[in-house]
Amino acid sequence: CEVAYSAAKAAVIGLTRALAKELGPSGITVNCVSPGVISTEMNAHLDQEALAALAEETPLGAIGTPEDVAEAIWYLSSDAARFVTGQVLAPNGGLVI
């Protein structure tokens, strides 16, 4: 259901920002990853035509992979992101610009 999914995603973003403010003074960073269209079971019901249309809407012209999301998570959990908190990293190929 699109409504439930969208509401839950918005809640996670709000929780991320609130926790970042609350836990920042303790040196704890809180971020979230908000992927776009990714080639997973969630989209398995879509036919090739629908997937091609989604890819075409994306400025990079492709559907993301689970590896794209994993790389975003890796970055946020690495020392490279030690000064990043309260952010939403969106590996979405530019779909949401």
Stretch-by-stretch model annotation:
Residues 1-4, 27:
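Conserved catalytic loop/helix region of short-chain dehydrogenase/reductase
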Residues 8, 16:
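Active-site helix of classical SDR
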Residues 13, 30-45:
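Short, flexible catalytic-loop segment of classical short-chain dehydrogenase/reductase
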Residues 21-25, 82:
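Alpha-helical segment proximal to the catalytic Tyr-Lys
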Residues 25, 35, 78:
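Short, conserved catalytic or interaction motifs in soluble domains
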Residues 26, 31, 87:
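Rossmann-like NAD(H)/NADP(H) cofactor-binding core
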Residues 32, 55-80, 84, 91-93:
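C-terminal helical subdomain
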Residues 44-58:
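A short C-terminal helix-loop "cap" of Rossmann-like NAD(P)-dependent dehydrogenase/epimerase domains
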